[in-house]
């Protein structure tokens, strides 16, 4: 499920491995790696899909949120924790308030429909998985 022939917006776990951390984050890449390497050993790993970093970047670019972020951060004193907290809250709200572009929404809806097609009562979990979350000098909890 890609965007006009460029990078995919959604990737299935069985398409992923540890070489894909930069595309889908550590948790998603690990789930893909487990499906690939442990399913044949009888370990049950639930199927699923990940939205890609490219999908997120496209969302920010096409909606104009990225420009608003740059403008806000240019005016923010990065040494002032209070200003940073306010800027972070504003950025989160912009992201929450901005609808997905139809292409991304359709990719996620299609993947969800495919995943739930076999079980009308299926349960789902939504997890964050930042592309740099497992680096020793970075924390991206909640991204």
Model regions: which residues?
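N-terminal beta-alpha lobe that positions the nucleotide/phosphoryl donor
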Residues: 1-143
């Amino acid at each position: 499920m890609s965007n006009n022939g460029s990078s995919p917006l959604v990737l299935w776990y069985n398409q992923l491995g540890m070489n894909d951390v930069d595309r889908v984050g550590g948790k998603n890449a690990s789930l893909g790696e487990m499906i690939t390497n442990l399913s044949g050993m009888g370990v049950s790993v639930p199927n699923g899909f990940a939205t890609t970093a490219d999908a997120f970047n496209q969302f920010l670019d096409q909606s104009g949120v990225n420009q608003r972020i740059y403008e806000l951060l240019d005016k923010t004193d990065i040494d002032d924790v209070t200003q940073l907290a306010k800027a972070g809250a504003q950025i989160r709200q912009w992201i929450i308030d901005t609808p997905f572009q139809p292409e991304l929404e359709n990719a996620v809806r299609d993947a969800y429909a495919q995943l739930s097609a076999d079980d009308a009562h299926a349960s789902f979990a939504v997890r964050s998985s930042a592309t740099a979350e497992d680096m020793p000098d970075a924390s991206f909890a909640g991204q």
